């Protein structure tokens, strides 16, 4: 009899996460997993707890109750440098007070590596994010969309390795300031990277149609609870969205992919 060994899937696992500020529950009993090689979108109305959940999943906040494990190890027990090489976070707002050039900002992502193979990493991620022409510009004078592209390049540089290992990339509204071309380019790039490497991407998105087009799974957060989780077809239906967003909307099918697309009624 042949012993068919099964390769374990690299996971980030959260179990019964709670997070309270004073007497208010911002996150309430959330359990989930994110596997390398998939793209996950977190959606939900304003105040649902999306950014707070992202900070819990990345170790920037410690839960009031519950645990979060990355590759089987509690996030709180990771060494900072090892964690920085395994997961990266692009926050919603990234203002700088000093006159750093774009290339210097992106190079900050290489801090955990001590200069190892920086040039190759920087050239690759700047090309991927359409930042080469911005390299010598002062980061502070860029448009909001240009700054988002630079921050994406920085976190990609942080996770770049010559021999890719399982890694997790978290992004908080990475397309909020981008024009249509760069929204499409960015999400195509992120999805492509999850197919080519053992990389997981988890991003908070407000645009439900972008989530439908590019995410493998969608997690709907409302009032601090994970109220729906599944494929775009499973989560993005009119009944569920109307219940939690309280908007007068409809759901149709994309003419090419047949994925759900959401529209507001007049």
UniProtKB/Swiss-Prot annotation:
Q: Which GO molecular function terms does the record list?
A: ATP binding; ATP hydrolysis activity
Q: Where in the cell is it found?
A: Cell inner membrane
Record keywords, A-Z: ATP-binding, Cell inner membrane, Cell membrane, Membrane, Nucleotide-binding, Translocase, Transport
- Show where the ABC transporter domain sits: 12-248
Specify the enzyme's EC class, one word: translocase
Q: Which NCBIfam families match?
A: PRK13548.1
Question: What family does the entry list?
Answer: Belongs to the ABC transporter superfamily. Heme (hemin) importer (TC 3.A.1.14.5) family.
What is the name of this protein? Hemin import ATP-binding protein HmuV
Identify the species of origin: Yersinia pestis
- What taxonomic ancestry is recorded? Bacteria, Pseudomonadati, Pseudomonadota, Gammaproteobacteria, Enterobacterales
Q: Which gene encodes it?
A: hmuV
């Amino acid at each position: 009899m042949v012993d068919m060994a099964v390769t374990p899937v690299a996971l980030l696992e959260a179990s019964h996460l709670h997070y309270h500020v004073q007497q208010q529950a911002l996150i309430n009993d959330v359990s989930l997993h994110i596997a390398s090689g998939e793209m996950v979108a977190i959606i939900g109305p304003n105040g649902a707890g999306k950014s707070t959940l992202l900070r819990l999943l990345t170790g920037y906040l410690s839960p009031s109750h519950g645990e979060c494990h990355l590759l089987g190890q509690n996030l709180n027990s990771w060494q900072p440098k090892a964690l920085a090489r395994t997961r990266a976070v692009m926050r919603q707002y990234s203002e700088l007070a000093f006159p750093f050039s774009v290339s210097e900002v992106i190079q900050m992502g290489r801090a955990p590596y001590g200069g190892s193979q920086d040039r190759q990493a920087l050239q690759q991620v700047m090309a991927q994010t359409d930042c080469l022409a911005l390299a010598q510009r002062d980061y502070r004078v860029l448009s909001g969309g240009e700054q988002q592209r630079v921050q994406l390049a920085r976190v990609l540089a942080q996770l770049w390795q010559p021999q890719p290992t399982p890694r997790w990339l978290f992004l908080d509204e990475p397309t909020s300031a981008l024009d249509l071309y760069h929204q499409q380019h960015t999400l195509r790039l992120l999805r492509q990277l999850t197919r080519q490497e053992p990389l997981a991407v988890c991003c908070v998105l407000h645009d439900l149609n972008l989530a439908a087009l590019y995410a493998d799974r969608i997690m709907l957060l409302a009032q601090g609870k994970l109220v729906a989780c599944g494929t775009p077809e499973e989560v993005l239906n009119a009944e569920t969205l109307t219940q939690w967003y309280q908007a007068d909307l409809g759901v149709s099918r994309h003419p090419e992919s047949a994925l759900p697309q959401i529209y507001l009624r007049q």
